[in-house]
Amino acid sequence: IPGLPIVPAAVAVVLLFMALNLFGVTKVGNAQIVLGGILLTAFVIYVIAGFVHPAGFRWETFIAGETIFVHHSVWANLSRMLATIALVYNAYVGFEVIADDAEEVSNPDRNIPRGILLSLTMTTIIYVTVSLVTLGTVPWQQLAGSETALTDAVQHFIPGWGVPMMAVAGMIATLTSVNSAMLSATREAFTLGRDGVWPTVFSKLSR
């Protein structure tokens, strides 16, 4: 948001979710469901509109950037793939925190593995389809120097309200990350305190 002071805004977000955590795991989980649902809806709209609209995904644009392995040797393709993996890995960091909250989940032996597999599957589908639409809409040369690739692409096939939608989606993505990270951190602190690794004060419960 132009003109918004970064540090005060960040502090406000942290305090907001810290206060939310004081109301218990159920409130935190419900907030995550709502925020995640809004974020998923925005991505679904982005992908569908990008593939359907004439000004959206174009195979010619996608191929022009050589974004898939075309006319390269095996070693060249392998080198490109490994270089990409190093970057893509960070996008998947976070699914492991599901296990941190195992004690808050009913039937964790069944639901935790399902949650991890389902989250990885959904994340992979979203990342692949969003990347296809983005790289097939805007030439990679334009995206290379951009810090707002999705908003650059969405204005081609959802003019008007597309850019605000993706801007809000970006902010919500940050909020979901903060919310899940804070829940995971509190559970880790509680467990470490209970096991005697950290001071026992961290294992005390209000009720």
Predicted segments, located by residue:
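Membrane-interface helix termini and inter-helical loops of multi-pass transporters
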Residues: I1, A55-H71, W140-T148
